[in-house]
Amino acid sequence: MQAVETPVLGQVHYRDLREWLALVEGFGELTHVKGADWHLELGAISELNYRRKPTPALLFDEIKGHQPGFRVLTASSSSSRRLGTCLRLSTDLTDAELVEALRGRPLRWEQSAPRYAPRVVSDGPILENVREGAAVDLSLFPVPFWHEHDGGRYIGTGCSIITCDPDTGATNVGAYRCMLIDDRTISVQIIPGKHGRVHYEKWFAKEGRAPLVVALGGDPLLTILSGLEVPTGISELNY
């Protein structure tokens, strides 16, 4: 067995998903797909792509029945280079180098998380397009019907669901499935035992409702963290 040298990690800078897409396209791992149908075709293309080696990220646009610019990204972190970029480690890590780069880091991230509280800001691109009340229309989004026997169209697969504990204010970010019910409603599936489920059960016991945020198209790093088992007491927003 050949030893793997500890990789030299450079600083990777990107502010949002758009800048991340530009980085990935720059090193040749982004494929544009135009004109796919949200009903099964988008999911089938994505499934076949996952079986390819190497596996590029796919950016779907001009999806059937929807305006250009309403896009869907799949396979965002399905290569060492893209995962290393998401984690802001390096843009050119091999599989072995990524494993070496991550050695011991999760524990250090857990230990240092309390020192990195989220910073609340009053402005940002997320506030450029706002729809409230009767103007809410989820049909604008090209929500895929991914697989033949799915129960519906899932808008939340690579997503971040943010909840908080009503007693302590502690936050949690999880990747829970969200299904489109109608133009104004989605359902969120959080199985028992998950931190988000603990939070909303507390809210329902107190007020009969539970506030939460469904974040789509955010920083790819947050999407990855949403799927991790971060220990109780540590928020993914700090981690």
Functional labels for PLM-detected ranges:
Residues M1-Y239:
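Extended, highly charged
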